């Protein structure tokens, strides 16, 4: 009981959720197949070279990106060790293990400059999403693309208790986004957006 505290976010996603989060993500992907398919189409239109999938969950987008001929390597980053093991196993079984590496955090990816960043349904779970945008910007190559979405809303009935929605945090996020990135039009009617590093 009580509020989800920003200082607890890392431990929550790394330790507390266990395999339950993996199963919940898999079920959500199955029930949202049309939406997931559209985000995969958008990713296929936009990514190339070195791709970061940040907070990649069960790895659907990372594995799809790794299968693209335009992609050299996918750097899958997720705090949850169960998600990491699941994605490694899936990459191995799909013959993509050479094009995909699994990491706990962005700092363990070395000094790679990314040509594309994929961060879907993650930013609203971070206690400082503006800082994450700045870190992405710093690690992106000139002209790189970011595929992002977010939902800074706890819900009308509190159905998203692990989303941060403080108005000052959200305002700071949009100010950072607008200062560091330029939105790129795409024709798909989905919440995911494309941005070019400014």
What kind of region is each of these model predictions?
Residues 1-112, 133, 149-150, 157, ...:
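Conserved N-terminal segment of class I S-adenosyl-L-methionine
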Residues 118:
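A conserved beta-strand element that flanks and buttresses the S-adenosyl-L-methionine
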Residues 122:
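Hydrophobic adenine-recognition pocket in adenosine-nucleotide-binding enzymes
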Residues 125, 129:
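Di-metal (Zn2+ and/or Mg2+/Mn2+) metal-binding site signature of metallo-dependent hydrolases
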Residues 131-142:
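A short glycine-rich, Lys/Arg-flanked "PGG" loop and its adjoining helix->strand segment in the class I
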Residues 143-151:
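Conserved beta-strand signature within the Rossmann-like core of class I S-adenosyl-L-methionine
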């Amino acid at each position: 009981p009580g509020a989800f505290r920003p200082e607890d976010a890392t431990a929550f996603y790394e330790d507390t959720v266990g395999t339950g989060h993996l199963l919940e993500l898999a079920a959500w992907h199955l029930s949202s197949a049309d939406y997931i398919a559209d985000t995969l189409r958008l990713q296929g239109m936009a990514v190339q070279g070195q791709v970061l999938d940040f907070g990649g969950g069960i790895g659907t987008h990372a594995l799809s990106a790794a299968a693209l001929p335009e992609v050299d390597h996918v750097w899958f980053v997720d705090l949850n060790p169960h998600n990491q093991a699941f994605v490694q196993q899936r990459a191995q079984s799909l013959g993509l293990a050479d094009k995909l590496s699994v990491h706990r955090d962005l700092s363990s990816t070395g000094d790679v400059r990314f040509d594309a960043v994929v961060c879907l349904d993650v930013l609203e779970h971070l206690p400082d999403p503006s800082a994450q945008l700045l870190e992405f910007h710093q690690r992106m190559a000139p002209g790189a693309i970011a595929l992002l979405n977010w939902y800074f809303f706890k819900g009308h009935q509190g159905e998203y208790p692990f989303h941060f929605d403080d108005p000052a945090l959200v305002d700071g996020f949009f100010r950072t986004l607008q200062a560091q990135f330029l939105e790129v039009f795409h024709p798909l009617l989905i919440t995911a957006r494309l941005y070019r590093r400014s």
